[in-house]
Amino acid sequence: MSAALSDFLKQSNLLQVTDGGPLVAGTDGVEGTRVDLVGEVEHAIIQVQETELLAEVCNTVFDVMKQNGEVLVFSTDLTTAHRKLRIAGFRVTELAADWPARGVKSVNFGDKVTLDLGNATVEEDLIDEDGLLQEEDYEKPTGDQLKAGGCGPDDPNKKKRACKNCNCGLAEQEEAEKMGKIAEASAAKSSCGNCALGDAFRCATCPYLGQPPFKPGETVKLSSVDDF
């Protein structure tokens, strides 16, 4: 054991953590100290071989160690020991071959910064919703505006028909109009007596125009037929 390492082991307030295994030669006579307060440890040695336990011990030692405190880890796998020290927060320094893994607690805290939030108040961020509306937004829509736009291109000379996969509402509108006409025709009374005979015998104002012949008193029902 080098003189420098021997001097380290003679430090006062030395924290020693072992897993109960055989101690490294030269450390068996070291008396460990009991930690009562966080941040009071200046020097520590760790002799733990199990990887998961070593990680937990390194984290604990980091928490109780003073700023610029120094810890030595005696391990058969220095690469793993260095990694566990770094993960715990220690700054690892490479030493001579006869030295164990060495870590120094070096944590820098930045200065406090005061945030300038200004004098803005919550009321200044609120927007009057009514102020976003225009005059035309208050106008009540007409019946034509509420009707479905229809399928296909606009053609003033042709009546719009709902397409097969209509999703604009025109198909429902046509169905409602059709059912209204059927209900109106069912409630109508014949004035000429020829309504049940068919279009060839019906007058120009007959409510049954376009419907098939039927028996007098029979309710006229049209089957839903797809034109496409």
From Swiss-Prot:
UniProt free text on domains: The C-terminal domain binds 2 Fe-S clusters but is otherwise mostly in an intrinsically disordered conformation.
GO biological process, one term: iron-sulfur cluster assembly
Name of the featured protein: Anamorsin homolog
Entry GO MF terms: 2 iron, 2 sulfur cluster binding; 4 iron, 4 sulfur cluster binding; electron transfer activity; metal ion binding
Region Disordered: start-end pairs: 138-159
Region forming the signal peptide: none
HAMAP family recorded: Anamorsin
Subcellular localization: Cytoplasm; Mitochondrion intermembrane space
Required cofactor(s): [2Fe-2S] cluster; [4Fe-4S] cluster
Subunit (UniProt): Monomer.
A cellular-component GO term for this protein: cytoplasm
Region (Fe-S binding site A): 151-168
Motif Cx2C motif 1 location, chain numbering: 192-195
